[in-house]
A protein has these predicted regions:
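Short hydrophobic core segments
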Residues: 43-45, 152, 172-183, 217-218, ...
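Beta1/beta-strand and adjacent pyrophosphate-binding region of the FAD-binding site
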Residues: 36-50, 211-221
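Flexible, glycine-rich terminal cap/loop adjacent to redox cofactors
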Residues: 45-50, 54, 59-71, 84, ...
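Glycine-rich flavin
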Residues: 6, 15-19, 23, 38-40, ...
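N-terminal mitochondrial targeting presequences
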Residues: 24-38
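Gly/Ala-rich phosphate-binding loop of Rossmann-like dinucleotide-binding domains
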Residues: 55, 59, 228, 232-233
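FAD-site-proximal beta/loop scaffold in flavoenzymes
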Residues: 195-211, 302-376, 461, 469
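Residues that mark the start of a beta-strand
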Residues: 41, 62-64, 213-214, 348, ...
């Protein structure tokens, strides 16, 4: 009887990912699995931004596509424990800050006895994540992408095994091409172990059960500044410790970095720049963090907090993929070398996203996923990394694309600057959001836009206009002569380009 029901399961499944013999009294881990074999045109290892987009694009181009993802939900770090939940918390904390700090009074809105319901804040975050990850699963069904839940391990140039938690083979997929889109993971800090309650990673920081009184952030890059802002707005006293002499991470323009630091200091942030963390230890309910000056190690200090966030970067997740057996080496940072078509040294195996060179950004991975699949289908493969934007979701937001002044000086490129402050922008005035500016860097001889940097409440949206202009090789004059709706924040972008081309803007 059991055998009959088993074969019934096999014959009624169009493409089973595994067949399991159910034996009463045994746990799920003890049940015997029978690996299936699947034939495919494309296997994508990883269901994050790069992987899920590549999977859908492959299916849309007529490829029989299988995505191997070990998580309980699709979307990778970005949707589950990164971009999306952090933006939800940033949004909620911003609203709380406006009400609690009395910022609404100037608009004639009086709010008394403002209280924080942290559990409801977290519920909003969870609901957002659930909706978006579920949306990807629906897109997979719509586009006929098969999701095999497991850890992908490449066994040959045209074969991948999906492994279960115990290392057993769930499915074997034979395929024409393979895309590695395994993303990245939190870089550990030597000597510190995450308990995700007091000593926390970016993942644990998204789910704290109470607001810390004193909150120390190791690393004042994009992630550290954003997550620090969440808890600072909710009432924590925040201190950021940064090894470098500036904040904001790699690629940020020096002038922009200085201005956002001033804004954060005004919001009661404390900064320890050019400072190295030597040790951190628990003492009762507190954490004692020992630091020293980078240039003068004799200058030492001890700081106390009740929560310590470690944000010292991320590293590619490229272990246990079977790369070594195929002759695919990784560089000193664990990244997979690829050519300009995103092929590894094995022509049928490609890699995209955080596990290769370039900034670890979801939108960069998405673009690479699309063009890699188009290349496999015979199309052209091109991406201009100078046109990949970056955003820090503070308030006001920070956005940039292309070269910074420091880059241009280092490369010996002659340039001109056009700037326009939001203090002189009509929409910024109406919204009482006048902090910030737009800065254009254009070639001194050709007027071609080389870089755009901005600080404003909607920089994350507005920077995309700059990306479009640069992608099509626009000059400052091109943008300056393009009509912009009034009153809008985007007018500042036009005015800054006027300043770059004509030497001065109209409204300042």
């Amino acid at each position: 009887m059991m055998q009959a029901s088993l074969w019934s399961l096999v014959t009624t499944s169009v493409r089973p990912t595994c067949v399991k013999r159910i034996v009463p009294g045994l746990t799920a881990a003890q049940q015997r699995r029978y690996a299936s074999t699947i034939e495919a045109d494309l296997v994508v290892i990883g269901g994050g931004p790069g992987g899920y987009v590549a999977s859908i694009k492959g299916a849309q181009l007529g490829m029989k596509t299988v995505c191997i993802e070990k998580g309980e939900t699709l979307g990778g770090t970005c949707l589950n424990v990164g971009c999306i939940p952090s933006k939800s918390l940033l949004n909620s904390s911003h609203y709380y800050h406006l009400a609690h700090a009395g910022e609404l009074k100037k608009f004639g809105i009086l709010v008394d006895n403002v209280k924080l319901d942290l559990e409801r804040v977290m519920e909003q975050k969870r609901n957002t994540v659930k909706a978006l990850t579920g949306g990807i699963a629906s897109l997979y069904k719509k586009n006929k992408v098969e999701w095999v839940k497991g850890h992908g391990k490449i066994t040959s140039p045209n074969q991948v095994n999906a492994l279960g938690p115990d290392g057993s083979v769930i499915s074997t997929i034979n395929t024409k091409n393979i895309i590695i889109a395994t993303g990245s993971e939190v870089t550990p800090f030597p000597g510190l172990e995450f308990d995700e309650k007091q000593i926390i990673s970016s993942t644990g920081c998204l789910s704290l059960s109470q607001v810390p009184k004193k909150f120390i952030v190791i690393g004042a890059g994009v992630i550290g500044l954003e997550l620090g802002s969440v808890w600072q707005r909710l009432g924590a006293e925040v201190t950021a410790i940064e090894f470098l002499p500036t904040i904001g991470g790699v690629g940020i323009d020096g002038e922009v970095s200085q201005m956002i630091q001033k804004m954060l200091v005004k919001d009661s942030w404390n900064f320890k720049l050019g400072t190295k963390v030597t040790t951190a230890r628990k003492q009762g309910n507190d954490i004692i963090v020992s630091v020293e000056n980078v240039k003068d190690p004799s200058k030492k200090e001890e700081l106390t907090c009740d929560a310590l966030l470690v944000c010292v970067g991320r590293r590619p997740y490229t272990t246990n993929l079977g790369l070594e057996d195929l002759g695919i080496e990784r560089d000193e940072k664990g990244r997979i070398p690829v050519n300009n078509r995103f092929q590894t040294v094995v022509p049928s195996i490609y890699a995209i996203g955080d596990c290769i060179h370039g900034p670890m950004l979801a939108h960069k991975a998405e673009d690479e996923g699309v063009i890699t699949v188009e290349g496999i289908a015979g199309g052209a493969v091109h991406i201009d990394y100078n046109c990949v934007p970056s955003v820090i979701y503070l308030h006001p937001e920070v956005g940039w694309v292309g070269k910074s002044e420091e880059d241009l000086k280092k490369e010996g490129i002659e340039y001109k600057i056009g700037k326009f402050p939001y203090l002189a922008n009509s929409r910024a005035k109406t919204n009482a959001e006048t902090e910030g500016f737009v800065k254009i860097l254009a070639d001194k001889n050709t007027d071609k836009i080389l870089g755009v940097h901005m600080i404003c409440s909607c920089a994350g949206e507005l920077i995309n206009e700059a990306v479009l202009a640069m992608e099509y090789g626009a000059s400052a004059e091109d943008v300056a002569r393009t009509c912009h709706a009034h009153p809008t924040f985007a007018e500042a972008f036009k005015e800054a380009n006027l300043a770059a081309y004509f030497g001065k803007p109209i409204n300042f």
